[in-house]
């Protein structure tokens, strides 16, 4: 049985492999600053995709962990993205999207769900 760190790493690798098969290039993985960590940052055709990966084995009420993605978490994530952009100025002119990849466990399940996080306003997080 995997611990939570193992589940998270496994989920990130699964999502990364899928994105790479679709032509996305890895820019950063587990990039961190004082505001938090960005699980995956990938790029394709002037688009940057920041991916928050949630791996869960539970099928309870909040089996995706969406309740943990509250306003405070969103604000920290926006600030972390702002820090990432400050250290990666090459990508400042790219379009930027934030998505959550929902990875079910056990690994035998083949489906991934994606949630696009709208209203990505980096300036509001300053």
Curated annotation (Swiss-Prot):
**InterPro entries, per the entry:** Restrct_endonuc-II-like, tRNA_endonuc-like_dom_sf, UPF0102_YraN-like
**Top-level division of the source organism's lineage:** Bacteria
Please list the GO terms describing molecular function. nucleic acid binding
Q: Please name the PANTHER family in this protein's record.
A: UPF0102 PROTEIN YRAN
Family recorded in the similarity comment: Belongs to the UPF0102 family.
The name under which this protein is listed is UPF0102 protein PMT_0624
Which species does the entry assign this protein to?
Prochlorococcus marinus (strain MIT 9313)
């Amino acid at each position: 049985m995997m611990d939570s760190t193992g589940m998270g790493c496994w989920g990130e690798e699964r999502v990364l492999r899928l994105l790479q098969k679709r032509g996305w290039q890895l820019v950063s993985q587990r990039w961190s600053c004082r505001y938090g960590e960005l699980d995956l940052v990938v790029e394709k055709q002037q688009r940057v995709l920041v991916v928050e990966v949630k791996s869960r084995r539970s099928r309870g009420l909040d089996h995706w962990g969406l309740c943990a993605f509250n306003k405070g978490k969103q604000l920290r994530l926006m600030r972390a993205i702002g820090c990432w952009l400050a250290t990666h100025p090459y990508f400042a002119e790219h379009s930027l999207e934030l998505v959550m990849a929902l990875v079910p466990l056990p690994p035998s399940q083949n489906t991934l769900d994606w949630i696009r996080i709208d209203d990505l306003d980096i300036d509001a997080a300053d």
